[in-house]
């Protein structure tokens, strides 16, 4: 319990008025003062759940399945104080994502009985927990547009996508309100995890409610109404979207969804979520939404609504000023040469559902499904930077290895634990009784952690400086 957690009296009174009668107010307050259980989600782009459980079976980790996400687990660790979860080898290799359990629920709702994943939009995506969860379902097929308004969070979003092996993403940096006009009827599936007042996050941060007020709720709800309208306009007819928040008041949740229904009438259908997982009915509202109070599942507070679009709706007319697209698509013959060189050098195969583009001396891999959106939306970053072209050939990039390598390549060098720690600290490796030449895929316990190059009797470290960890790394 954390008795110092700040809970405004006005907030308590508001919850008392809206919380279902069968739920206890005392349990709600006690839950708000109880620290949140940590949770992770296995990244199935890199490893299966079964293989992950085998891999961590020698650790002092107690993993409890999250009922609404078959790749999610609550985690308890004995060594949390000596090594942070983010500095474990498995995390740095992208084998799992640290994600609050409740935040896995919107993507579960998005994906259930939904295979329309050719063109997907995550409208407010940073830092990337739900984006990478969606990417796991897509298995790098189709195109995943990940939008983020805050410029400072784009870099973190990209780093997380790269670490997790996502190569079908295209990043945009806009207010989400532009999508309805710029890209109407463009996306099969949309997640709008809307910016909110964060009432459900009180268990993570005792001061989360320090700036909370009823008036601020109304200001935020106005933004959310604009966002949900834009998302619905950008959704294809027949498509499906999920609206979610990590807050509890009605203004930012039910009322926003009702506003959408009032605006577009029968074009909007709320699909009930009572059978989303065993026990989901405990948080079900009369509209079929999930309104998750923290004491129900011992989790963060959350709201999830699943919405189907049955008819096209009016969209704003906009004048686009895109500028010249700075990339040129590579002809099939040249793409084949690049693919051959990548295979010959690193034993990596280019994905079939992708295009190769160039910008000056840079070589990039874009998802093929991105083509219809080029010229319609301005992108901040797309796909994966494969290489830089030099006189002697291609200099392959770290992100190419992290997204495309499997660890089973002929040129893979598997490091011992002490060597792996040195690698993550940005140092070169000197393998004993081993010599080679050229570039190599560097692995730890058979999973890629970067690209290196033989220089004499050492492997030169190719880890980007921003990914170097200096202290508090995993135990050997």
Swiss-Prot record:
HAMAP family: 16SrRNA_methyltr_F. Belongs to the class I-like SAM-binding methyltransferase superfamily. RsmB/NOP family. Pfam families: Methyltr_RsmB-F, Methyltr_RsmF_N, Methyltranf_PUA, YebU_pre-PUA_dom. The keyword Magnesium does not apply. S-adenosyl-L-methionine binds at residues 124-130, 148, 175, 193. It catalyses: cytidine(1407) in 16S rRNA + S-adenosyl-L-methionine = 5-methylcytidine(1407) in 16S rRNA + S-adenosyl-L-homocysteine + H(+). The keyword Cytoplasm applies. It is found in: Cytoplasm. GO terms for molecular function: RNA binding; rRNA (cytosine-C5-)-methyltransferase activity. One of its GO terms (biological process) is rRNA base methylation. The active site is at 246 (nucleophile). Specifically methylates the cytosine at position 1407 (m5C1407) of 16S rRNA. It comes from Photobacterium profundum (strain SS9). InterPro entries: Methyltr_RsmF_N, MeTrfase_RsmB-F_NOP2_cat, MeTrfase_RsmB-F_NOP2_dom, Nol1_Nop2_Fmu_2, Nop2p, RCMT, rRNA_ssu_MeTfrase_F, SAM-dependent_MTases_sf. Its EC number is 2.1.1.178. Keywords: Cytoplasm, Methyltransferase, RNA-binding, rRNA processing, S-adenosyl-L-methionine, Transferase. GO terms for cellular component: cytoplasm. PANTHER family: 28S RRNA (CYTOSINE(4447)-C(5))-METHYLTRANSFERASE-RELATED, NOP2 YEAST -RELATED NOL1/NOP2/FMU SUN DOMAIN-CONTAINING. This is Ribosomal RNA small subunit methyltransferase F.
